[in-house]
Amino acid sequence: MIIDAIEAAFTRAKKQGWEKTYWLFDLHDTVITSNYGVGEVEEYFPFALETLKILSDREDIVLILFTSSHDEKIKVYMEKFKNLGINFNYINENPEATNSSYANFDVKFYFNVLFDDKAGFHPMKDWEPVYQYLIEYYGK
């Protein structure tokens, strides 16, 4: 479950003394419904925006948009998120994690938590528990 990944990320960060964790978010069928190019109507899944807002407000969490959308659509999405008070730090990259003696991030960039329907995230089931966990974890 996604909560296990979140708890593992927080635990690892605390143990290692890391100041940040890196969270990837696919867009279609994860944050918003897919319309497969038919029309412009896309809907946010319940609790997605509320959860993203909590995460966006945290200095210890880096949000990365992980999408195969075309650049012009990404600009539209980023503007929409910005207007909602949700700020993704990066798009399809994590320049903060650099190569080291034990890891090469030239092709696969570093992240701690992945929200993607292709990776088992179920937006209709998983957003609310994540939201509730963060409310409890952060005391909001």
Model-derived regions: residue spans:
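HAD-like aspartate-dependent phosphatase fold
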Residues: 1-140
